[in-house]
């Protein structure tokens, strides 16, 4: 398999698991076995523990500068904010509506990139986003929305903004050049801690 095909395959596989995770967490939370935040903590903690041995070995071979470490930790904070905001929106939105709204992530990345870096958005990109918006409209059952649904929409939009900030921050700081195992381990570890603090804080509000 050529490097290009291998990269495309891994990217599709990554997208599959990224999309599967919230579906599984939503189903688990509805059974009462765990809350949304509990599911997120388990997700990020297990990922961190699985990556930890490989991350330590890679970090020992090539230590990460403190500046890049801080930048990576901030990426983890944005990741935690993205997930926590999305799952918080489910308190006011049906799960299907919340997931549909999350498809706005690419649109926010495009708009933020255009605003910050003055990038031109191609007609093809607008067409793809228009198709996504039509899909969201078809997936959303507006009659199922509860009173106060605007709060859920606000949290879903905050989640999309956090995701866009995560993408733009990583691109601006060239974090894709870092060791992927070390980077992912730090991001998921920070996200697990961030979600835990969010869960504790919400319990005392």
Name the predicted role of every residue range.
Residues 19-20, 45-49, 107, 133, ...:
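Small-residue-rich packing faces within the transmembrane alpha-helices of Major Facilitator Superfamily
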């Amino acid at each position: 398999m050529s490097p290009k095909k291998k990269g495309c395959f891994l990217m599709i596989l990554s997208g599959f698991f990224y999309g599967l995770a919230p579906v599984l967490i939503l189903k688990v939370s509805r059974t009462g076995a765990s809350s949304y935040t509990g599911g997120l903590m388990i997700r990020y903690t297990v990922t961190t523990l699985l990556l930890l041995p490989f991350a330590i070995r890679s970090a020992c071979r090539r230590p990460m500068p403190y500046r890049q470490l801080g930048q990576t930790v901030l990426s983890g904070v944005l990741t935690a904010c993205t997930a926590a905001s999305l799952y918080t929106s489910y308190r006011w939105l049906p799960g299907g509506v919340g997931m549909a709204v999350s498809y706005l992530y690419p649109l926010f990345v495009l708009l933020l990139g255009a605003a910050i870096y003055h990038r031109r958005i191609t007609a093809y990109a607008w067409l793809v986003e228009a198709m996504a918006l039509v899909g969201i409209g078809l997936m959303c059952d507006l009659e199922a929305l509860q009173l106060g649904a605007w709060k859920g929409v606000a949290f879903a939009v905050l989640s999309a903004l956090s995701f866009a900030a995560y993408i733009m921050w990583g691109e601006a700081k060239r974090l894709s050049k870092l060791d992927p195992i070390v980077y992912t381990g730090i991001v998921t570890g920070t996200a697990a801690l961030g979600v835990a603090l969010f869960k504790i804080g919400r319990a005392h509000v």
